[in-house]
Amino acid sequence: MEYFDMRKMSVNLWRNAAGETREICTFPPAKRDFYWRASIASIAANGEFSLFPGMERIVTLLEGGEMFLESADRFNHTLKPLQPFAFAADQVVKAKLTAGQMSMDFNIMTRLDVCKAKVRIAERTFTTFGSRGGVVFVINGAWQLGDKLLTTDQGACWFDGRHTLRLLQPQGKLLFSEINWLAGYSPDQVQ
């Protein structure tokens, strides 16, 4: 289990100066050729997403103005707050900030031949399935994960195991991304 606080994470500026990324975790850890990776990006200007052949990307707008996504003849989509959207990461996708203001989004990328991610917003206590990886990011409220208290802009990632996230207040929102390994793969086999 790895814990993080977005406000304390290192920031990597994009080469095109259109934004910045805070990497949450990769699996296998510290590998350039990852099977899955979670990050938070701040987008300050219109531009294209980086290409990652053989990967799927799920992007979820966390805050800021809506973002219009366009991929040639494949899709046009307006990304709205807390509504995950998946697309192939090997296609050119242009992002346009619709309100002209900076936006922040959560990204999870998975290698298509190894695993698949599912992203959802939780508003109540829940338990994850065992032997799957996952990432949580607190949007608001106070959540208990094991002996750790998580609040706004904090989270955790893990590579296997069963975990309960307990909402400690009457209301709260948490982004949860679950990693499902395809047949023939497991975290132990791919490290």
Curated annotation (Swiss-Prot):
Q: Which SUPFAM superfamilies does the UniProt record give? A: RmlC-like cupins (SSF51182)
Identify the PANTHER family for this entry. PROTEIN VES
Q: Enumerate the Pfam families for this protein.
A: HutD
Gene this protein is translated from: ves
Q: Which residues cross the membrane?
A: none
Per the similarity annotation, which family is this?
A: Belongs to the Ves family.
Name of this protein: Protein Ves
Do you know which InterPro entries this protein is assigned to? RmlC-like_jellyroll (IPR014710), RmlC_Cupin_sf (IPR011051), Uncharacterised_HutD/Ves (IPR010282), Uncharacterised_Ves (IPR023482)
